[in-house]
Amino acid sequence: MFLMNILCLVIPILLAMAFLTLVERKILGYMQLRKGPNIVGPYGLLQPIADAIKLFIKEPLRPLTSSKLMFTLAPTLAFTLALSLWIPMPMPHPLINLNLGVLFILALSSLAVYSILWSGWASNSKYALIGALRAVAQTISYEVTLAIILLSIMMMNGSFTLSTLTTTQEHMWLIFPLWPLAMMWFISTLAETNRAPFDLTEGESELVSGFNVEYAAGPFALFFMAEYTNIIMMNALTTTLFLGAFHNPLFPELFTVNFITKTLILTMMFLWVRASYPRFRYDQLMHLLWKSFLPLTLALCMFHVSMPALSAGVPPHM
């Protein structure tokens, strides 16, 4: 029975991830005044399936001087972690209702750094190594602000359980009282998922494709799938944290529809940002975090910690 639950969670995520690749190509196409994929199937709808078949039947080549174990382990770890991050997500019921769901998500997203580091180092290529080092520095840096923002939200929520956020936001979405944090959170999720304008790891002009430059076929597809699964997961988390999904006991099915719609809109914003902005320079990326976001989030976190003490109230303060 539990295996069935896991399959019911994983299969829709994989389908959503597959069609997100198509949506991205379509949206970028229309923004650049062209059609995008429109040959495979009606309106190009079967393109992701064709891509998957093509990638998984190709021979997975490996550089002669690479570390065999780490080279194959890294993409598997990346994809496993990307799927595991969904375990505590309330949609409306999580797979496992964890007391410390927020800490679980933070811990697993930190572990994802290892897969990037291993893939860059095991490839034995200078492009892959530089790309991996950049990705690790970027991910670790932005996780600091993500953790502080999450702490502020948990102060408003009163617990580390994600499921209670729905109750907290019954009367008002947390995006209204926490809008500076929400903006910084959204930008940090862009950096955390290595998306434009923060895709320094795969600067085509200098690093070819970044840490996955030596990968081909199946292992490359796993990295690709992990990236897009993480994008949907981050947007689902943003929806849960700031745009508390509609909760009505009379129409429980509306919760999921509402949740999916908000996640989709946020994902479209990711794609819109990608189509609109040029890439940041590496030093600008680090300055933005350490000199702008970190002091601001720390100040706001102190403010949210002091609120219960001042008002002598118990969270949620809504």
From Swiss-Prot:
Which UniProt keyword terms apply here? Electron transport, Membrane, Mitochondrion, Mitochondrion inner membrane, NAD, Respiratory chain, Translocase, Transmembrane, Transmembrane helix, Transport, Ubiquinone
Q: Which GO terms describe its molecular function?
A: NADH dehydrogenase (ubiquinone) activity
Q: Which InterPro entries match?
A: NADH_UbQ_OxRdtase_su1/FPO, NADH_UbQ_OxRdtase_su1_CS
Write down the superkingdom of origin: Eukaryota
Q: Which Pfam families match?
A: NADHdh (PF00146)
Gene Ontology BP terms: mitochondrial electron transport, NADH to ubiquinone; mitochondrial respiratory chain complex I assembly
- Tell me the enzyme class: translocase
Q: Give an example GO cellular component term for this record.
A: mitochondrial inner membrane
Q: Which reaction does it catalyse?
A: a ubiquinone + NADH + 5 H(+)(in) = a ubiquinol + NAD(+) + 4 H(+)(out)
Q: How does it sit in the membrane?
A: Multi-pass membrane protein
Predominant location category = mitochondrion
Q: What are the cysteine partners in each disulfide bond?
A: none
The residue ranges crossing the membrane are 2-22, 37-57, 69-89, 100-120, 136-156, 171-191, 231-251, 253-273, 293-313
Q: What is its EC number?
A: 7.1.1.2
**What does the UniProt entry say about where the protein is found?**
Mitochondrion inner membrane
Question: Known PANTHER family for this protein?
Answer: NADH DEHYDROGENASE SUBUNIT 1, NADH-UBIQUINONE OXIDOREDUCTASE CHAIN 1
Q: What does this protein do?
A: Core subunit of the mitochondrial membrane respiratory chain NADH dehydrogenase (Complex I) which catalyzes electron transfer from NADH through the respiratory chain, using ubiquinone as an electron acceptor. Essential for the catalytic activity and assembly of complex I.
UniProt-listed HAMAP family: NDH1_NuoH
Q: How does it assemble?
A: Core subunit of respiratory chain NADH dehydrogenase (Complex I) which is composed of 45 different subunits.
- Report the family membership: Belongs to the complex I subunit 1 family.
User: Know the name of this protein?
Assistant: NADH-ubiquinone oxidoreductase chain 1
Organism, by scientific name, is Euphractus sexcinctus (Six-banded armadillo)
